Amino acid sequence: MSKPRKPKGRPISGWLILDKPVDFGSTEAVSKIKWLYKAEKAGHAGTLDPLASGMLPIALGDATKTVPYVMDGRKIYEFTVSWGEERATDDLEGDVTKSSDKRPSEQQIRDILPGYIGTISQVPPQFSAIKIAGERAYDLAREGETIEIPSREVDIFRLTLLACPDADSAHFEVECGKGTYVRALARDFGRELGCYGHVSGLRRTFVAPFAEGAMVPLADLVALEAIEDMDERLAALDALLIDTCEALSSLPHLVINDDQAHRLKMGNPILVRGRDAPVAESEAYATARGKLIAIGEIGQGEFRPKRVFA
């Protein structure tokens, strides 16, 4: 008989809201956090480009089951557009492909913004993670291929011009939905204004439902490595985690008893009839004694588990 496998890390669950520094990739950040926490598994809720800084929510352990609910949330970015150059990557990293001596006035910039608010059609950048015929667009672009990426609808809830520090740049804030490319906004601004443009600075300040104040700088986490006692170090790190349920705050919440929790963990539905039961059919999550038990569907007076938590 083979021996049972030992877990490769601690069975912790929670969210760390990392303030990612510039020149640090999202995958690299996840690996670093997983190692620091000695976690069994980890994953992030939305890539941030290496040249971008700011909020990168990282799920540890069972919290990785809640990643899709954060991926779909609203996001807020502050970004700077530099005028006069369009680049292959639509940011500072790429080669210049088009240039112009023209510069827009502040009023000209303000005049175009209403056209970018609401549900708009957007073509993702050539260097993006979009799949074309089974391959990532950025892989094809690196091989020198010019590819036709179909446009898609994205939601822009708010778009504000914050400042024009000089004739060559403008600073914006945007609140947007899933799948929006800020680099594509900069590209399209430049084309409409007839001066070309690219993102020269990008910071994400909000990923629903996590507030900006929840962010933890990477340097603060690394500093905890100086704690020699491993138990003390891990306790200090764990104190920075946000409860897994926080990612589900947009869903109806069922508070259940121990018997119901046992049924759900066995994969069985439970009855939710009663005065406090949600009326409409919907997705929901259930907790017992303050602990997340399951995410599931409510329908026909039952809660049916889809994802069960240890």
Swiss-Prot record:
Coiled-coil stretches are none
Q: Name one GO molecular function term.
A: tRNA pseudouridine(55) synthase activity
Q: What is its EC number?
A: 5.4.99.25
**Entry keyword set:** Isomerase, tRNA processing
What does the record give as the reaction this protein catalyses? uridine(55) in tRNA = pseudouridine(55) in tRNA
Q: Can you tell which superkingdom this protein's organism belongs to? A: Bacteria
Q: Which CDD domains match?
A: PseudoU_synth_EcTruB (cd02573)
Q: Tell me one GO biological process term.
A: mRNA pseudouridine synthesis
Active site per UniProt = D49 (nucleophile)
Annotated function? Responsible for synthesis of pseudouridine from uracil-55 in the psi GC loop of transfer RNAs.
| Family, similarity comment | Belongs to the pseudouridine synthase TruB family. Type 1 subfamily.
Q: Which NCBIfam families match?
A: TruB
Q: What is this protein called?
A: tRNA pseudouridine synthase B
Q: Tell me the gene name.
A: truB
